[in-house]
Amino acid sequence: MEGILCASPGCGKPAKLQCPTCVNLKLETPSHFCSQECFKTFWPLHKMYHQKGQPENLPSQFRNYKFTGPLRPTNITPMRKAPEGIELPDYAIGSIPISERVADRKNMANIIHTPEEIEIMRQLGKMSREVLDIAGNAAKVGMTTEELDIIVHNAVIERGAYPSPLNYYKFPKSCCTSLNEVICHGIPDERPLRDGDILNVDVTLYWKGFHSDLNETYLIGNVDERGKNLVKCAYDCLELAVAMCKPGTLYRELGDAIQKHANKQGFSVVKNFCGHGIGRLFHCNPTVPHYSKNKAVGAMKVGHVFTIEPMINEGTWQDEIWPDSWTAVTADGKRSAQFEHTLVITETGCEVLTKRTNGSYIDRHFK
């Protein structure tokens, strides 16, 4: 408990014990005290935190769910809509991506994109980067992920594009916001960001018939060294994988390099979520696993467009899905970090279509 002070108002002494009920409920509350006396004095107020953490205050589908970590869902506002005049993907109305299902049934091979298609995706990648940077610059202590979703939604619409996650298999928001132990596909809600959080924002745009996908993990306030190391490891894993991309590289080789680096840093690599082909379809071939000894098929060819998005965990690589059918969390409740780019294979290597235009992530967030 080094560095933690007593939660009793006006005390300020170093904490020596923690409320056992808060521990059992995995509550993110002021729960440390310097002595039994302070604990008993503050108890009439402190016990109110326990009421807030009880299942009856959670969305109904969570009331019998055993959470793996301290994060809890809060209220989710109604789904927004795109205004008239915005080109819609095939799932925007009915929620089912029919074109993806047709491609799956036909087991379509990796697509070789034309120079004209790549130019559209190049412009789209730049737009997607602009939107993500707007969200990243806005994220701060006290802001809710719902507010970030509004920012993303408006920024996408202002660019004449559609936020690809919106109503994709009924996903209710315009971006994914994944906090702390959430690996991916977190749903923006009304929980305020807190000092020490790590937050991943995942943005995808649909424009002129194509999708572009990227994400980054941000440090909210003062993050501990272990958390910073986790985030930097995820960033480095993406960078080293991108550096390997060129004609002839086997897709399965990326996972070997990513896992080797993550394990060396004391972290693990998620196996159940992968990078993917992208273009006219939100998700298509190739599948791009991030773990070693995977069975990914094929080699990179000029014109292939796909994402790399390693998810790196502080503890176990295993995950489970919340009852909302979307939010993927670590099985042990420890934190996860992720970074993603969309890139195209060229004659001489690759071009990152979602690259930064204002300095590297590390330069901006770790110095």
Swiss-Prot record:
Matching PANTHER family: METHIONINE AMINOPEPTIDASE (PTHR43330), METHIONINE AMINOPEPTIDASE 1 (PTHR43330:SF7)
Biological process (GO), any one: proteolysis
Residues that bind a protein: H185, H283
Binding-site list for Zn(2+) 1: C6, C11, C34, C38
Naturally occurring in which organism (per UniProt): Dictyostelium discoideum
Keywords: Aminopeptidase, Cytoplasm, Hydrolase, Metal-binding, Protease, Zinc, Zinc-finger
Major subcellular location class: cytoplasm
Pfam families assigned to the protein according to its UniProt record, in alphabetical order: Peptidase_M24, zf-C6H2
Subcellular location: Cytoplasm
Protein name: Methionine aminopeptidase 1
Protein family per UniProt: Belongs to the peptidase M24A family. Methionine aminopeptidase type 1 subfamily.
Function per UniProt: Cotranslationally removes the N-terminal methionine from nascent proteins. The N-terminal methionine is often cleaved when the second residue in the primary sequence is small and uncharged (Met-Ala-, Cys, Gly, Pro, Ser, Thr, or Val).
Entries under SUPFAM superfamilies matching the protein: Creatinase/aminopeptidase
Residue stretches in coiled coil: none
Keyword presence, Iron: no
Entry binding sites for Zn(2+) 4: D213, H276, E309, E340
